[in-house]
Amino acid sequence: MGSIGNGRSDSVVGIQMPPAGSKMVLEPEALQVTTSPVPRWPRLGVVMVATRAVAMVMALLSMSLMVSSKQRGILTIFGIEIPLDANWSFSYSLQFLVAMSTASAAYSLAQLLLIAHKAVKKSPIVPSRRHAWLLFAGDQVFSLAMMSAGSAAAAVANLNRTGIRHTALPNFCKPLPRFCDLSAVSIACAFLSCVFLAASAVIDVIWLSSP
């Protein structure tokens, strides 16, 4: 057999082993892992700023319109002229609406200023889940408060416009149209502020559900 001679083969496969005293250490390449607090929706921060800004504007409009709703008129009943003086401060429901609109506007303004401060420092708008939970709680509280205030004021405005059935109490909005119109627009703005605060709460939930 010519292929084997003197204990050697014609084709030799050599394997070089490391010396006995040497140590081989395999160092894996380090993988750079970067984490970012930005949620799955990159424009979610822009939507959050927009909803809070609109909620603040609606609350300010509700407050300013209700405060300016003052008017004097004359109501004629059976030929008797009765002077009327309509003012938002005469009703506890309208006072509650003004107070809650002011508080809601201040809350939204504080959140916008905080977001602007973080934008200047180039830090995340919502740095932690705890902060997101606080935002969610605040948005929920003020949204429900604006709904409650708007509903109470709407009951008073509807009573002024329609009067009381089965009684001789007339429609006060006929001699006081400006007061009733401003009150109605103010109440509508309050409900819009409630809607945008509720939208902010939904955005907070989306932020919390982000990985």
UniProtKB/Swiss-Prot annotation:
UniProt GO cellular component terms: plasma membrane
Lipid bilayer topology: Multi-pass membrane protein
Pfam families linked to this entry: CASP_dom (PF04535)
Keyword Membrane: yes
Domain of life per record: Eukaryota
Any coiled-coil regions, as ranges: none
Alphabetically ordered keywords of this record: Cell membrane, Glycoprotein, Membrane, Transmembrane, Transmembrane helix
Record topological domains on the Cytoplasmic side: 1-45, 117-131, 208-211
Chain positions carrying an annotated carbohydrate: 87, 160
Compartment(s): Cell membrane
Residue stretches spanning the membrane: 46-66, 96-116, 132-152, 187-207
Ranges facing Extracellular side: 67-95, 153-186
Family, similarity comment: Belongs to the Casparian strip membrane proteins (CASP) family.
Quaternary structure annotation from Swiss-Prot or TrEMBL: Homodimer and heterodimers.
Designated name of the protein: CASP-like protein 3A1
